[in-house]
A protein has these predicted regions:
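Two-component histidine phosphotransfer core
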Residues: 1-188, 196
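Short C-terminal beta-strand
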Residues: 195-205
Length: 205
C-alpha cells in the first residue's frame, strides 16, 4: 500500500512538473518579439540614409540596439518593471515614426505605475496590432496608449485611427493573458473614426 502511494505521489509530481513545463513553453511561444520584417525595414532604411543623412542613420541604429538589447536580455525574465517595458514601447514607436513620419503617438500614465512588475513585452502586441495595418494608409494616423492604476487594477487602452477588422489577431494576446492572470478583461471597441482595445488586469497583492 505504501509503495502504491509513493508511485501515485511520484506520478502526481511528474504530471504537475510536465504541466508547468508545457505552460512555460506555451508562454514563451506567445511572448511577442519584434518582428523580423520590422527589423529588416529599419536596416533597409538605415542603409538608404547612410550616405545622405548619417546622423539619422546613427539615431536609427542606436534605437534599434536598445530594442534588441531588451528583447535578448530583459525579456527572458518572468517579470520586469513597468517602466522598462514602457521604455521598450517608446523606443519601438520612435523607430516606427522614423520609418513612417505619418505616425503620431502619445503615452499617458496615471497612478503609481512605474514600479509595477509586469510580464515582459506585455503591451507591444497591441501596438503591432495597429502598426502593421497602417502600412496601407497614406495619411496621418495616431496611436494613443493610456495606463492607469486604480483600486488594485491596471487599466490599459490602446486607441488608433487605423481601422482594423481582423479581431482574430487578439487570440494570442487573450491566450497569454489566460496563462498569466487569474482575472482580466479584454475588449475591442470599433467606432466610425477610432478603434480601441481596453484591457483590465487585477494586480496580485
Amino acid at each position: 500500500m505504501i509503495t502504491l502511494l509513493r508511485h501515485w505521489l511520484d506520478y502526481g509530481q511528474r504530471a504537475s512538473k510536465l504541466k508547468k513545463e508545457k505552460l512555460h513553453s506555451e508562454l514563451e511561444q506567445l511572448k511577442n518579439q519584434v518582428s523580423p520584417q520590422f527589423l529588416l525595414n529599419m536596416l533597409s532604411k538605415a542603409t538608404e540614409l547612410a550616405v545622405v543623412d548619417p546622423r539619422q542613420t546613427s539615431a536609427i541604429l542606436v534605437q534599434l540596439g536598445k530594442l534588441l538589447r531588451y528583447q535578448l536580455y530583459d525579456s527572458s525574465r518572468e517579470k520586469v518593471f513597468f517602466s522598462a517595458d514602457l521604455s521598450f514601447l517608446e523606443n519601438f514607436l520612435n523607430l516606427e515614426k522614423m520609418l513612417n513620419p505619418m505616425l503620431c503617438f502619445t503615452i499617458t500614465k496615471e497612478g503609481p505605475v512605474n514600479y509595477l512588475l509586469v510580464p515582459p513585452l506585455l503591451f507591444i502586441p497591441f501596438v503591432e496590432y495597429f502598426i502593421y495595418q497602417s502600412e496601407r494608409i497614406e495619411k496621418e494616423y495616431y496611436i494613443h496608449l493610456a495606463f492607469r492604476v486604480e483600486k488594485g487594477e491596471l487599466l490599459f487602452s490602446c486607441a488608433s485611427s487605423v481601422r482594423h477588422r481582423d479581431i482574430s489577431k487578439l487570440d494570442n494576446i487573450r491566450r497569454r493573458l489566460e496563462l498569466l492572470y487569474e482575472t482580466y478583461s479584454l475588449e475591442e471597441v470599433q467606432g466610425d473614426t477610432e478603434n480601441r482595445i481596453n484591457m483590465h488586469l487585477t494586480l496580485s497583492r
